[in-house]
Amino acid sequence: MESTQEFQVPLKTIRLTDGTEYQSYHTEGSLSDKKPSDYKNGIPKIRKEWIRTRLDRGDTNHSQMYYAKKGIITEEMRYVALRENMNPEFVRLEIACGRAILPSNRNHPELEPMIIGRNFLVKINANIGNSALGSSIEEEVEKLHWAVKWGADTVMDLSTGKNIHETREWILRNSPVPIGTVPIYQALEKVKGKAENLNIQVFLDTLEERAEQGVDYFTIHAGVLLHYIPFTANRVTGIVSRGGSILAKWCLAHHKENFLYTHFDEIIKVMKKYGVSFSLGDGLRPGSIADANDKAQFGELETLGELTKRAWEEDIQVMIEGPGHVPMHLIKENVDLQMKLCQEAPFYTLGPLVTDIAPGYDHITSAIGAAMIGWFGMAMLCYVTPKEHLGLPDKEDVKQGVIAYKIAAHAADLAKGHPGAIKRDNLLSKARFEFRWEDQFALSLDPETAKSFHDETLPQDRMKTAHFCSMCGPHFCSMNLTQELRKFAQEKGMEEKSEVTICNRKKESGK
């Protein structure tokens, strides 16, 4: 164990009117008391001393997998164990075998450590970032605040517009959650948008720049191989990954193998130096139901499994990105094959969307697939907003996407039987049956919306204790009628009579 330093982890305490307290996982952490306008002050650097100790002793590999394999329980692992209510040694073992990752760049001291793995709570990622069409630095920091307020466990900065470096710097200095990026976007900007002019040195320079700033994980599309590209020719929607299409264009322009694949060992060196984790990108993921589970998708997945082994040999953490658009009956095949080919490295999926017919509602079409794939063993879900396929999401879209995916993640935790997952459901159900409206609001994922919907028709304070809502009114509420029935049965001793009746019937039937 690195130290015996004591520390506290962020938890959100919900105090109920019956005196009960519920503590939930809290992603907002030290951002809770800050305003986006204060972004130039940053947030506390809670990992500063932990990192300094490792630098002072000359560590050359800053990956949590490196320490885990050496039998060391780091402060980050202890922190995660407290957040997840798990044993620190279990956390270490999961990281050591590659079944979980703890993304934590040595240059992101503001990070409040979290873990991604199938044996832990299902996590969600939110994407933010500017485009060539607009959005300021302050707006992007505000999106970060907004995403973690509603429960994003990690955030990816996908900026492609102006001031990319400065925008990313302030996102990192204000982020209590891991930040991921896709370096190929900025590399493309450096060669004036011409994919054929990309080369490994431009990419490595971009990688080093981002790692130096503190980015915790990189999406690297190293599995888009030259001989897989023809498999996409007859697809309905071709190659839908931006990174995948950029690298496919480079491969075809030069008729050479993907330079991210051929120079993978050089990329590993940068990851090792800063403790950055791989998020191996699915550049050939299906972009429509018709293309799901095809030869291109699964061919790339096999290569990602090979690259995972190469990264693990150097003690670098890896998670695998997944689809995409997949109908419900094909989802389990994705998980089973990923676990087999990638040796149970954490699976990180975009949805998947289970139908293509609902533009404007793809946060719903994808949350259905997300709940299913989470149940089957996926570790982290990348959210989809209502604007998917239509435009750049705004603040409200970010909220809608995060809430939809928090529902999917929690549903998966319930289905997997994660310890403690059902407690919040039980507390809310009890509050609902007892007509404790304020407690129902407080326990919901979005208290503001729950309260506003209730108050649209019954805004008066006295209605916060009423034994009905506007759906049924005072005379048709099933829960109120059930309470009256129970009271009547208790007064008349009906429970004892019922037990006697059941006993007599069993005797008559010879049971």
UniProtKB/Swiss-Prot annotation:
Residues engaged in binding substrate: 127, 156, 185, 221, 241-243, 282-285, 321, 348
Catalytic activity of the protein: 5-amino-1-(5-phospho-beta-D-ribosyl)imidazole + S-adenosyl-L-methionine = 4-amino-2-methyl-5-(phosphooxymethyl)pyrimidine + CO + 5'-deoxyadenosine + formate + L-methionine + 3 H(+)
Organism: Leptospira borgpetersenii serovar Hardjo-bovis (strain JB197)
Leader peptide range in chain numbering: none
Residues that bind [4Fe-4S] cluster: 469, 472, 477
Chain spans, region Disordered: 492-511
Name of a matching Pfam family: ThiC_Rad_SAM
Family of this protein: Belongs to the ThiC family.
Name of the gene this protein is made from: thiC
Name this polypeptide is given: Phosphomethylpyrimidine synthase
Ligand binding (Zn(2+)): 325, 389
Cofactor remark: Binds 1 [4Fe-4S] cluster per subunit. The cluster is coordinated with 3 cysteines and an exchangeable S-adenosyl-L-methionine.
Pathway note: Cofactor biosynthesis; thiamine diphosphate biosynthesis
Entry keyword Transmembrane helix: no
GO cellular component: cytosol
Chain's role: Catalyzes the synthesis of the hydroxymethylpyrimidine phosphate (HMP-P) moiety of thiamine from aminoimidazole ribotide (AIR) in a radical S-adenosyl-L-methionine (SAM)-dependent reaction.
GO biological process assignments: thiamine biosynthetic process; thiamine diphosphate biosynthetic process
